[in-house]
């Protein structure tokens, strides 16, 4: 079974085809068990800009007060989640939409980044504290494809937005997935980005951990998520270009991109 992190850069509907979701639907209908975790950065940015919110950032992290969080939650667990689920249902897939806290799936805790050696409170931004995959196992056994938005609550019922890559990693680990596929906007992990000749086709988790500190900017979060997925129980991770249909099809067929093996 596979867990897929889908960026959701464009909201799908059946007036316009979404080749990535069509490929995922085809794989599911061919018998593959799939869990899909989605992001929604562009939609969140657009919604916040419309309201004049979310402009404050600390060390690259958006400061998420209650008003900002309410917009984020509405976009992720409403607009984006429903759009993806509706599209998959229109492709004859038994898709079910969940927030990351539904059915006791994930318990969150507040995430506080370290800035200049000090822990900083940036509001309703969380990380995975606990995970119980029973709801996903039940749904998959009954023939459903779960679609998860990365919004979860803590033990007091307080909601948090969690990085979708880390949600996918936690889900893949808890389910002991054969593969966790991170669909991104580059062809895989590069040793020396932006040198495209430095693309890594395959690497062990041990070697990736050794070179992990050398990664910066956009590559670092994917590397951290890949390590987290395998450390928590997934058998492999593949990072592939979600903007290129051929790359997506290859990834679903256990090829291409960067393979990280346990």
What are these regions (language model features)?
Residues 2-262:
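C-terminal catalytic "cap/lid" subdomain
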């Amino acid at each position: 079974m596979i867990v897929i992190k889908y960026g959701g850069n464009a909201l799908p509907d059946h007036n316009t085809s979404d080749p990535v979701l069509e490929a995922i639907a085809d794989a599911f209908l061919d018998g593959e068990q799939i869990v899909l975790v989605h992001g929604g950065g562009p939609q969140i940015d657009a919604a916040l800009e419309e309201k004049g919110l979310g402009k404050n950032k600390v060390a690259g992290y958006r400061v998420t007060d209650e008003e900002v969080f309410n917009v984020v939650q509405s976009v992720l667990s409403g607009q984006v989640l429903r759009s993806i689920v509706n599209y998959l249902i229109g492709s004859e897939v038994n898709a079910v939409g969940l927030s990351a806290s539904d059915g006791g799936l994930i318990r969150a805790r507040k995430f506080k980044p370290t800035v200049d050696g000090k822990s900083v409170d940036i509001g309703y931004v969380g990380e995975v504290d606990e995970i119980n995959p029973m709801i996903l196992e039940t749904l998959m056994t009954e023939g459903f494809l779960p679609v998860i938005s990365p919004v979860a609550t803590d033990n007091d019922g307080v909601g948090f937005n969690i990085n979708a890559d880390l949600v996918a990693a936690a889900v893949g680990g808890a389910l002991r997935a054969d593969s966790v596929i991170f669909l991104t906007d580059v062809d895989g992990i590069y040793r020396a980005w932006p040198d495209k000749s430095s693309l890594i086709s395959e690497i062990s988790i041990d070697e990736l951990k050794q070179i992990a500190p050398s990664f910066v900017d956009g590559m670092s979060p994917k590397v951290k998520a890949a390590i987290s997925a395998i450390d928590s129980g997934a058998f492999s991770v593949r990072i592939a270009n979600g903007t290129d249909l051929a790359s997506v099809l290859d990834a679903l067929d256990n090829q291409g991109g960067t393979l990280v093996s346990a």
